[in-house]
A protein has these predicted regions:
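PAS-family sensory domains
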Residues: 23-25, 86-92, 105-107
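Terminal output helix/cap of sensory domains in signal transduction proteins
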Residues: 61-86, 91-93, 148-153
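Conserved hydrophobic beta-strand signature of PAS-family and PAS-like sensory domains
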Residues: 29-33
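Short hydrophobic secondary-structure edge segments in sensory/regulatory modules of signaling proteins
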Residues: 18-22
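PAS and PAS-like sensory/regulatory domains
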Residues: 16, 81-83, 90, 95-99, ...
Length: 162
């Protein structure tokens, strides 16, 4: 059983978008090896049409170059990365996306692929607090209800953003 087969077993019917990419960090960027169906409503692309493309295809003018650079550095070093950034849907609409990327390592500890958990978030307007700008709340794109972390044991979104 391959890594993709294992991920497919738990992610195929998940409401959170899941991507698996290779580790090629050439100029074109890593290639998507697997995308679950939940990525479709999030990005406006069918999950099958994303296979073989780079996640960079979802980025655009308002995607922070600083965040892209920091993400690339972390992934090239074999570390995970968690952030909110602006991505773009197939129709060109910008949306705020929370992404939690983790390396998938083999028995020798080498990174074989990366898995990314993605979800749209909305800004919640609140009074600013020292050290905090804005709080974010995950949103289920199908219902606009507050999303529930389906991978609670794995906790891919546990961070100061929660």
């Amino acid at each position: 059983m391959t890594v993709i087969d294992l991920v497919r077993q738990f992610a195929e019917d998940a409401r959170t978008g899941v991507l698996v990419t290779d580790t090629d960090f050439s100029a074109a960027g890593p290639k998507i090896l697997y995308a679950n169906p939940a990525i479709g409503p999030l990005t406006g692309h069918s999950h099958t049409s994303l296979i073989g493309r780079s996640p960079k295809a979802l980025q655009g003018k308002a995607t922070s170059p600083f965040t892209r650079k920091a993400m690339g550095e972390a992934l090239r070093a074999g570390r995970g990365f968690h952030t909110c950034l602006t991505n773009y849907r197939a129709d060109g609409e910008a949306y705020l996306c929370e992404i939690d990327i983790r390396p998938l390592r083999n028995d020798e500890g080498e990174v074989e692929a990366f898995i990314a958990f993605e979800r749209a978030v909305e800004r919640r307007r609140v009074r600013a607090r020292p050290g905090k700008n804005t709080r974010y709340r995950p949103v289920d794109p199908a219902t606009e209800d507050e999303a529930v972390n389906e991978f609670s044991d794995f906790r891919p979104f546990q961070s100061p953003l929660d």
